[in-house]
Amino acid sequence: MTHSKTDRLYANPLAQVSQFVFDENVVDVFPDMIKRSVPGYATIINMIGNLAERYTQSGSQCYDLGCSLGAATLAMRHRIQAADCKIIGVDSSAAMLQRCAQIMAADTSDIPVDLVEARIQDVPITNASVAVLNFTLQFIPLDERQSVLNNICAGLRPNGVLILSEKLAFEDETHQQLMIDLHHNFKRANGYSDLEIAQKRTSIENYLIPETLAAHRHRLRTAGFHSVDVWFQCFNFASLIAIK
């Protein structure tokens, strides 16, 4: 049920490259796509489970915001030791959630998981000890990102955490180009052609909007988190932990 097809969505020349959407075609290849496109993704997922084990409080809720097929949800579900907890997975893609529900049903953990089809911007966060935005905020319009983080921080218990993973931009143009080149080399090493890389880049242009670490730190501090720092980075992909 979790078997993933090989990502060949952009393998052939397209007369017009449409904006990327998380539809059934992406669902079918998503695990392969993200493994071959995001350096360190497996490590990030594993460590989300580790962090959830450390920070989940008894009787609280954990949120996977932009859960896609539930990789972070499963990582938390398999590691949480605190009693009477629930995980809430949220995604705006019906196709993603349908497949995610099948994956959760096949999993043997007894921690309850609720799946909600909604925009992250519209989801109330309550009684939370852990929230995850794993490569999700980058798809939310820039002018809505602060309110999303404000909402999360307000809904976290004291000492609750947000794990925020994002593709990064860099202020220094030389470093920015270096990170792009290294990332593209990573994708080539994983079997993507230059055509696939170029067409995928066109599809997410003006949709996936990366920001600098400084911008993320400032926004998290503004939201009310007292401790913010990077715990993982590979090239232009990083994950931060923010503690309330």
From Swiss-Prot:
Q: Which UniProt keywords apply?
A: S-adenosyl-L-methionine, Transferase
Cite the Pfam families for this sequence: Methyltransf_25
Coiled-coil residue windows: none
Gene Ontology biological process terms in this record: tRNA wobble uridine modification
Q: Does the keyword DNA damage apply?
A: no
Recorded GO terms, molecular function? Answer: carboxyl- or carbamoyltransferase activity; S-adenosyl-L-methionine binding
Which reaction is catalysed here? prephenate + S-adenosyl-L-methionine = carboxy-S-adenosyl-L-methionine + 3-phenylpyruvate + H2O
Report the domain of life of the source organism.
Bacteria
InterPro entries in the record, alphabetically?
CmoA, Methyltransf_25, SAM-dependent_MTases_sf
Task: Name the Enzyme Commission number(s) assigned to this protein.
Answer: 2.1.3.-
Entry's family note = Belongs to the class I-like SAM-binding methyltransferase superfamily. Cx-SAM synthase family.
Q: Which HAMAP family match?
A: Cx_SAM_synthase
Q: What is said about its interaction partners and assembly?
A: Homodimer.
Q: What is this protein called?
A: Carboxy-S-adenosyl-L-methionine synthase
